[in-house]
UniProtKB/Swiss-Prot annotation:
<keyword id="KW-0808">Transferase</keyword>
<keyword id="KW-0472">Membrane</keyword>
<keyword id="KW-0444">Lipid biosynthesis</keyword>
<dbReference type="Pfam" id="PF13091">
    <property type="entry name" value="PLDc_2"/>
</dbReference>
<dbReference type="Pfam" id="PF13396">
    <property type="entry name" value="PLDc_N"/>
</dbReference>
<dbReference type="GO" id="GO:0008808">
    <property type="term" value="F:cardiolipin synthase activity"/>
</dbReference>
<feature type="active site">
    <location>
        <position position="407"/>
    </location>
</feature>
<feature type="active site">
    <location>
        <position position="222"/>
    </location>
</feature>
<keyword id="KW-1003">Cell membrane</keyword>
<dbReference type="GO" id="GO:0005886">
    <property type="term" value="C:plasma membrane"/>
</dbReference>
<feature type="domain" description="PLD phosphodiesterase 2">
    <location>
        <begin position="395"/>
        <end position="422"/>
    </location>
</feature>
<keyword id="KW-0677">Repeat</keyword>
<comment type="function">
    <text>Catalyzes the reversible phosphatidyl group transfer from one phosphatidylglycerol molecule to another to form cardiolipin (CL) (diphosphatidylglycerol) and glycerol.</text>
</comment>
<feature type="active site">
    <location>
        <position position="229"/>
    </location>
</feature>
<keyword id="KW-0812">Transmembrane</keyword>
<keyword id="KW-1133">Transmembrane helix</keyword>
<feature type="domain" description="PLD phosphodiesterase 1">
    <location>
        <begin position="217"/>
        <end position="244"/>
    </location>
</feature>
Length: 482
């Protein structure tokens, strides 16, 4: 037997071993298990390499350090809120917030997401307005600027923002940037050179430790947060790049949703940034000092919780929040996501709502961002139509918003898509909102988007070609690992 034959046998044995690990040792969703078995079975030579890069679960090693949070009373505040809500003694700001006590309690217990009720919130659905506001706030910063973005491109918008950050760092402000190593893979390190020379600090999240191979490639930090002086925070779907200003020929106008927050909810955003920074950086760790958590004298009336989720937890906090919202629906469910690949639990919740007479409307893009993901999205949308849910195809560019609005009373806005990746593989962050005026603005934006969309009817869906149907079937089969 030649050397090549020996190598082939070794590879096949490794393939069987990884298949066994997938089935018997790693705790994962059944659908994902079967999807990986298909890959390992039908790609026997390279299947285990693909699995090593994309399939392995994160180790049990602690990724985020909660040490030091007692200095600002986070655990104490969380425990107090849990107990007061359990004892029905919590001073809710208005009846609508109190009405959704069960959802608030779930997110408190599941994620430690403290409810804050004094927030002033501004809604952005256009990238130009969002980045103009963000840069204006950065220009006014006096102490620190903390940014975390999945994508930070070195294009016109990226350079415009970077020049401001370089100047603020040179002024002596504490300026820190986290970018995702995969999402920002085309951005060269030299882009940050002047920023670092001026005193700014930048860290990639989960960079490759080996040339060409990153064994944590599948686990990405998809969060988008900006915190200025601990006083103002931004959360939502916009990354940093020209395409988010509608400058891409492929996508055209970019429709997204982002929030500017002034109030105690910024504390939660700050805490999230500190934990992510201390995970990404081996030096210049951030301590929980008072400078990062200034005293607020809130004038706002928006109640909200900032909820994080990621592969470091088995609880899928944001998805559980979505399901709780959907199960509570009595009249309407309006949902926007560029990728609609729900797992069985979320899909069943939406189906039950539609079959119960709730007006369910789901909005998806009219063009693919990722080909396989898009075909899986249209397949799930087609299945949902069978329950009476209405599917709308956004036809005015590209819809990237991740928004869920229920009964005009509660809403969620953030970075988490309605897909397996956001629920199980990505590090995400969402705002759950309970104030009717803010929720109404989100509902109005959705209804305005419907005027720029067309409805996908069963008749139109049935006209798909045999090739499209085949691509949908394959994409859905692989959807748990896309």
């Amino acid at each position: 037997m030649g050397l090549l034959a020996y190598l082939l046998v070794i590879l096949l044995i490794l393939n069987v071993f990884f298949a066994a690990v997938t089935v018997f040792l790693e705790r994962r969703d059944t659908s994902a298990t079967w999807a990986w078995l298909l890959v390992l079975t039908f790609v026997p030579i390279f299947g285990f390499i693909i699995y090593l890069i994309f399939g392995r679960k994160l180790s049990g090693k602690k990724i985020f350090d909660w040490k030091g949070q007692e200095k600002i009373g986070i655990q104490e505040s969380t425990a107090n809120q849990i107990e007061m809500i359990r004892q029905k003694e919590f001073p809710f700001s208005d009846p609508n917030v109190k009405k959704h006590r069960d959802l608030i309690y779930l997110l408190l217990v599941n994620d430690g997401a403290i409810l804050t009720q004094d927030n002033e919130v501004e809604l952005f659905i256009d990238g130009h307005e969002k980045f103009d506001a963000l840069i204006a706030d950065i220009e006014k910063a006096k102490d620190h600027i903390h940014l975390i973005y999945y994508i930070f491109h070195s294009d016109e918008l990226g350079n415009r923002l970077m020049r401001v950050l370089e100047r603020k760092a040179a002024e002596g402000l504490n300026v820190k940037i986290i970018y995702d190593a995969m999402g920002s893979r085309t951005t060269k390190k030299s882009f940050f050179r002047t920023f670092e020379k001026n005193g700014g600090l930048v860290r990639p999240f989960f960079p490759s430790k080996l040339p060409l191979i990153n064994f944590r490639l599948n686990y990405r930090n998809h969060r988008k947060l900006a915190i200025i002086d601990g006083d103002v925070g931004y959360i939502g779907g916009f990354n940093i790049g020209d395409e988010y200003l509608g400058r891409s020929k492929k996508f055209g106008y970019w429709r997204d949703t982002h929030l500017r927050v002034h109030g105690k909810a910024v504390y939660a955003m700050q805490t999230r940034f500190i934990m992510d920074w201390n995970s990404a950086s081996s030096t210049h760790k951030i301590d929980y000092k008072a400078r990062y958590f200034p005293t607020f004298h809130g004038k706002g009336h928006t109640s909200m919780q900032i909820v994080s989720s990621g592969p470091d937890s088995e609880w899928q906090q944001i998805k559980n929040g979505y399901i709780k919202m959907i199960n509570a629906a009595k009249k309407t469910i309006y949902l926007q996501s560029p990728y609609f690949i729900p797992d069985a639990s979320l899909l069943e919740a939406i189906k039950i709502a539609a079959l119960s007479g709730v007006d369910v409307r789901v909005m998806i893009p009219n063009k693919p961002d990722h080909a396989f993901v898009y075909r899986a999205t249209t397949n799930y949308a087609g299945e949902l139509m069978e329950t009476g849910a209405k599917i709308f195809i956004y036809d005015n560019g590209f819809i990237h918003a991740k928004t869920l609005v229920v009964d005009g009373e509660i809403a969620s806005v953030g970075t988490a898509n309605m897909d397996f990746r956001s629920f199980r593989l990505n590090f995400e962050v969402n705002a759950f909102i309970y104030e009717k005026k803010m929720v109404q603005k989100l509902e109005d934006a959705f209804l305005e988007d419907i005027l720029k969309s067309y409805q996908l009817t069963p008749e139109l869906y049935a006209k798909r070609s045999l090739w499209i149907k085949f691509k949908e079937a394959v994409s859905r089969l692989l959807s748990p690992i896309l």
